[in-house]
Amino acid sequence: MRDCKKRTNFAGCFVVDNLIIMFGKLFKSKKEQVKLFYNTDVHCHILPGVDHGSQSVEQSLEMLKAEAEMGIHRVILTSHVTAVTFENTRETLMDAFMKLKDAVADAGIDMELYLSAEYRMDEYFDKEYAADHLIPMPGNHILLENSFQQELMNLDDLLFDMQVKGYRTILAHPERYNYYSRRRKRYEELHNAGARFQINILSFTGYFGEEARDSALWFVRNGMIDYLGSDMHNVKHAHIIMDYINSKEWRKIAPELEQTVKNDMII
């Protein structure tokens, strides 16, 4: 700091120097973004133009930059594959994937990308599964989505059949299926049968409602969270997650999550 004694306006000098100190403390006290304790996002909708997630390459790049800010260096792109609404195929997903990979390289973003999908268990899935058209994650993991209205009637049989064929089944955001929150023993049955659970960080924030939040915390208490996902559809979701992982609650539950979460083991 400059020496005030060499200046003629001592009062002005005092005010200026104190403002410098105040603003210096303000900027120094700004918290750095807390990083996640893992480096792999296993569930997101960053692939452009194939579902109701990212709608452009530019938006995808912004979302990937947000992932990097949270400490993510590997992203498994899991766009919706759903009857009628998003009947994506290997070809449509691969085309978008190659465009995004080229854009990421051109932008100089340090991010490993992997192509997979989030499969709604419906009639379109039955057709794709029978034709052996699924795009699994590394390690032959497959992300499955249940209906939000009711459980698939033959869920147990399907999971067993997929496991026999070598797939490692992951149930996407089970905390969001409110019909399970009223009979949580079903969670235990599915987990014991070999299904793994991926919980959305957004659910902890209350973004999907209090019932989903309560179920997410139940999973923490019972040590049944195998994977965490952003389920990011836009940059707004990223900002909500960033705020949450800076919270006291996240600092409290993160050590428990570290005991069970295996995101980085999937690749």
Predicted regions and their residues:
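An N-terminally biased module of ancient metal coordination in phosphate/nucleic-acid-related enzymes
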Residues: 17-109
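Extended substrate/RNA-proximal surfaces in nucleic-acid metabolism proteins
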Residues: 23, 87-196
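Non-catalytic positions within long, well-ordered alpha-helices that form the structural scaffold/packing
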Residues: 68, 163, 220-221
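Mid-to-C-terminal alpha-helical segments outside catalytic/metal-binding sites
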Residues: 8, 20, 25, 29, ...
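Active-site environment of divalent metal-dependent phosphoester hydrolases
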Residues: 81-85, 120-122, 176-180, 204-207, ...
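His/Asp/Glu-enriched short active-site or ligand-binding loop at hydrolase and phosphoryl-transfer sites
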Residues: 194-206
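Short acidic/histidine-rich active-site segments
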Residues: 224-240
